[in-house]
Amino acid sequence: MSTDAFVAAFGREPDIGWRSPGRVNLIGEHTDYNDGFVLPLAIPREARVLAARRDDRVLRIVSARATDVAAEVDLDSLAPGSVDGWAAYVAGTAWALQGHGVDVPGADLLVDGDVPRGAGLSSSAALECAVAGALLHLAGVELPLAAIALLAQKAENDFVGVPCGVMDQFASTHGRAGHLLLLDTRSLEPRHIPFDLAAEGLTLVVIDTRAPHRLVDGEYAARRASCEQAAVLLGVPSLRDVTDLGSAMSMLDDDVLQSRVRHVVTENQRVLDVVALLEAGDVRGTGPLLTAS
């Protein structure tokens, strides 16, 4: 995204540019909101933000793919539900930063990117993290990467209203070229795992199935709610804490809840097994585990 587009939109040069990548998850599906383990990697598709500070308390948000202002919001009036559409992810990030004590300045923001929307590649998390980086720079504030990821998640959870886990934002802030990110979503401890497929003559292929993926459509929230319900019935803080799968199955009489518990418990172990194989140099040995995921 060139600065010419910013000048065309706002009549002046930007002060800063920021970008954050999307992600794919190698293994560890539906485990992040169960305090489990995930193994994503950043991809060479990203959200990009150009920003310039304003002298007032207004955020003007424009998409590089449109000519009109998507949203113009008063920073002192931000509240969940006050901004619609994709601009809510931008405004929500400013709102979350303010709640953390950051004096977010007014700003003109031009947003672009090449992370496909609705394809399960975390375009929203990439946008939130890029906006957070740009606004923090304008505010003259530095925060740890983990704090940025958590604030981006808060924006999506509490402002936009999507009950996502924290994997996507951590992958966007902590992604490293040539590595997977092993994240314990309970301790929030990240560990980079070398991932050199080319050395094995392999390629990771990401395929767009054309099946729409929307976290806001209710299905994701329902799945998360069923996992939380199962944890309550089993008397554990989260499904991460289930240690005896057979016993857990016998305590549940609902097929859906049994399926949720079985997946989370076995998926957490598969993540750890994949990491062990990769660290032992056995990339090809991960295949059966990925198939079982």
For every predicted segment, state its role.
Residues 1-23, 27, 48, 52-83, ...:
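C-terminal nucleotide
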Residues 1-125, 129-145, 150-159, 164, ...:
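ATP-binding N-lobe of GHMP and related small-molecule kinases
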